[in-house]
Regions:
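C-terminal alpha-helical cap/extension of soluble enzyme domains
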Residues: 2-3, 12-19, 37, 41, ...
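A general structural signal for well-ordered alpha-helical segments in protein cores
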Residues: 31, 63, 67, 91, ...
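Catalytic alpha/beta core domains of metabolic enzymes, predominantly
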Residues: 142-256
Length: 305
């Protein structure tokens, strides 16, 4: 894989759908509907089994099946499959399954029970890279992994030919600070390695500041408004991108208060895209006043697609 460059799967808008459950089993019908909806929407890639897809709560057989369903129903849209797990041998097995399913790329976060060192993380990615014939996205998500990457660690991992993109946490919200932050990260990695942002409220600033990709929670359920932000930002239209993002401020506020997963699960349930109580236990969906507030925001913003 020497000389691999960023691919279509790791540029533009990447939509990460829920993996809805019904009676503690993956609701394949609902999941396929979500994937086909995304395939028709115009997103640049579909990210299966990300944090929004509850990968950490699914066993290997469930994850293999989800990967297969995603590729089968994504039409010609590239598919990124999450392969994160606690043990390296399990990650390698998941990488095998993802590639066998036809994934265009894989995404890996350094999951742990015992705290990991930087050397542990380099070893993980190096070991997994030997199994890959597709690009890999390094997933930096300290909110769930409790592991903090540094620019120096990005640089070490970017030496691996498999690494095509790094999914970074939200940059500072101010435009100039975001540009400076992203420029520092770009200086740490080769030009062939892209930078993608997670944290939907920061996406407009990050794309305008130099990120190549938005790895989006919102787009997995509501691709329409996410596409408005992404297309404007990637075209350099800061006014329209920021305006489109600012219109969603009530939704971003819900993300901040309840977590994006619970909010998009409620959105999907309210729109009939997922069954009630679609999250894996012990995660509880929003109820009562919190759920009613999500419905109020959906109605006020006319969010249906």
């Amino acid at each position: 894989m020497t000389g691999r460059v960023r691919t279509e799967a790791t540029t533009g808008l990447s939509a990460f759908p829920l993996t809805p459950l019904r009676d503690d089993r993956v609701d394949e019908h609902a999941y396929v509907e979500l994937v086909e909806r995304l395939a028709r929407s115009g997103v640049d890639s579909i990210g299966a089994l990300g944090s929004t897809g509850s990968y950490a709560y699914l066993d290997r057989a469930e994850r293999r099946r989800v990967a297969e369903l995603t590729v089968r129903h994504a039409a010609d849209v590239p598919v990124i499959v999450g392969i994160s797990a606690l043990r390296t041998s399990h990650v390698r097995a998941l990488a095998h399954d993802a590639q066998a399913a036809g994934a265009s790329a894989v995404m890996l976060a350094p999951m742990s029970y015992q705290p990991l060192t930087a050397d542990d993380v380099v070893c993980l990615y190096t070991d997994v890279a030997t199994e890959l014939s597709v690009p890999m996205v390094v997933y930096d998500n300290p909110g769930t992994t409790r592991f903090d990457f540094t620019p120096a660690l990005y640089a070490r991992l970017a030496e691996l030919p498999s690494v095509a993109s790094i999914k970074i946490p939200p940059p500072p919200p101010e435009a100039e600070a975001a540009r400076e932050h992203i420029a520092r990260l770009r200086a740490a990695v080769p030009a062939r390695v892209g930078l993608g942002v997670s944290g939907d409220p920061s996406a407009a600033a990050a794309l305008l500041g130099g990120c190549d990709c938005w790895y989006s929670v919102l787009a997995g359920t509501l691709p329409g408004p996410a596409l408005e932000i992404a297309r404007a930002a990637l075209a350099g239209d800061s006014g329209e991108a920021c305006a489109a993002s600012n219109r969603l401020a009530p939704l971003w506020d819900l993300f901040a208060r309840h977590g994006s997963l619970r909010v998009v699960a409620a959105v999907a349930e309210l729109l009939g895209l997922a069954p009630e109580d679609c999250l894996p236990r012990p995660l509880l969906g929003l109820r009562g006043r919190d759920r009613a507030e999500v419905e109020t925001v959906l109605t006020a913003l006319s969010l249906t697609k």
